Amino acid sequence: ALFCALATSSAFASQGTALLRQPDLSANQLAFVYGGDIWVSDKNGQNPRQLTSHPASEFAPKFSPDGKWIAFSASYDNNTDVYLMPSSGGAATRLTFHPSADTVNGWSPDGKKVIFASNREIANSRSNQLFSVHVEGGFEQKLMEAVAFEGDLSADGKKLAYRPNNMAYSGPSGWRLHRGGSTPPVWIIDLEKQQLEKIPHPNANEFSPFWLGDDVYFLSDRDNTAVNLF
């Protein structure tokens, strides 16, 4: 994702474009945010195309497993909700309608549900839980009762790798090399057996967990130099 984002950045360079954010990959495309809108390009970063154009901010694009759809969050109507649109472009469909902010996090492995984070059932506004909503709409379902800010489901949907703590501030990756009691770990929960596995956690920032086969990968600054993949 980083390489493709850099390639796209090079493609935009002749136009003086900067700050391409939140990249997500499908088999053939790269989605990213630029200027508060959702864009896609070829996987190699060429042929960028703008999918959304609205005064409100659109962010957190995530491809469906088959790459045909993009789920994203948007602040239309002065509220942040979950939306769905074809990855080739077209009209967006609103999936959530709650007054709390709903931020897209990913997809269920079968591509039938969008996973999002929300504080809708939390007394304070500084914590989130993970929910799912069907792509055809309907009532949202909570993945678990525990606080979670982001997570990724295993291929069979039985386990969730997630970050239970917020970052040191509300940005996407926290303060660089922050150390202290609030540094977030990555945990794995078996949703059927309700068994929790805590990945050994130094005093470091660890986030963005994802599954690759039976293994969980995540970003961490535990080597005290920069953020790397572990």
What are these model-derived regions, one by one?
Residues 25-27, 65-66, 109-110, 155-156, ...:
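Residue-level detector of Asp-centered blade-edge/turn motifs that repeat once per structural unit
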Residues 14, 33-39, 53-58, 71-83, ...:
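A flexible loop/linker signature enriched in serine peptidases of the S9 family
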Residues 14-43:
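Beta-strand-rich domains and repeat architectures in extracellular enzymes and scaffolds
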Residues 1-9:
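Bacterial N-terminal signal peptides
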Residues 48:
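Glycine/alanine-rich phosphate-binding loops at beta-alpha junctions
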